[in-house]
Design a protein with these regions (language model features):
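N-terminal helix-turn-helix
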Residues: 1-74, 234-242
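Amphipathic alpha-helical regulatory segments at dimerization interfaces
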Residues: 23, 74-86, 137, 173, ...
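A structural signal for short hydrophobic beta-strand segments in well-ordered beta-sheet cores
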Residues: 44-46, 93-94, 197
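Amphipathic alpha-helical effector-binding/dimerization core
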Residues: 49-50, 54-151
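Cysteine/selenocysteine-centered motifs that mediate thiol-based redox chemistry or coordinate metal-sulfur cofactors
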Residues: 142-154, 230-247
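Extended hydrophobic
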Residues: 159-232
Length: 247
């Protein structure tokens, strides 16, 4: 509750401990303990010369990440909703955090079963279509840093890459086809296709995906679904400022 206090979030706090103790209605000794914990985790930094505290690097990074994620979500909502309406399949948008993806939007189609990809859910990026779409658009050295050895690979269903070499092959196929795929890697009986969403820096800021019951689509339906997914990914990237080739 202390962290949510509206007057705590200032870039600098003059006479920090006294001000915070008064505003929060807690003893100064408790304030010192809280500030030490926040400083230890990089959330605040001590400004000795000014006898004050400022926002730490971790807080700045979290704020920047939230700002980016919030904008992506706002822009993506209508695009994803229309895609789900057009295809009749469940859709979602996810962002990369470490070697996991976090689902930030989920749009459920009518008469389709619920998925594990609810908003806020984290899953290993190497197993998900959204994660693979993002990873395939990152520099290879960045992917290797996220997945340096076999120990970095977790498993859900026994399917999916289990080593850096296998992941590299999976991502190479994604780059070749322009689509990331997973077939029961996350949940048995469900398949997903995904594309990377890029921002104005040509950075893969998110993955856009559709998930459907395995074997429920005819080949021509799958082709149509992929086409609509690609067009939606291109539109969303354009809306986020991407200007390069997105085909």
């Amino acid at each position: 509750p202390y962290a949510r206090h509206p007057r705590v979030h200032r870039e600098q706090w003059s006479d920090a401990s006294h001000t915070l103790a008064r505003e929060l209605g807690i003893p100064r000794s408790t304030v010192y303990q809280l500030l030490e914990i926040l400083e230890r985790h990089g959330l605040v930094t001590r400004l000795a010369e000014q006898r004050a505290y400022g926002i730490g690097l971790k807080t700045f990074e979290l704020g920047s990440a939230y700002s980016r994620q919030h904008r992506v979500s706002q822009v993506a909502h209508p695009v994803l909703a229309r895609l789900v309406d057009e295809t009749g399949e469940n859709g979602h948008l996810a962002v990369l955090h470490g070697n996991e993806i976090i689902y930030v939007i989920e749009e459920r189609a009518a008469h389709r079963p619920p998925l594990v990809s609810g908003v806020g859910v984290r899953l290993p990026s190497h197993l998900t279509a959204t994660g693979r779409a993002i990873l395939s658009a990152l520099p290879r050295n960045q992917v290797r840093a996220l997945y340096p050895n076999r120990q970095a690979f977790t498993d859900r269903t026994g399917i999916g890459p289990k080593s850096p070499k296998e992941l590299e092959a999976t991502l190479a196929e994604t780059q070749r086809t322009g689509f990331a795929e997973e077939h029961g890697d996350v949940t048995p009986g469900f398949d997903s296709y995904a594309v990377a969403v890029r921002d104005y820096n040509d950075f893969p800021i998110a993955g856009l995906a559709l998930t459907f019951v395995s074997g429920s689509l005819r080949p021509e339906q799958e082709r149509s679904l992929k086409t609509k997914l690609r067009l939606a990914g291109t539109e969303l990237s354009r809306r986020l400022g991407a200007v390069g080739s997105l085909t």
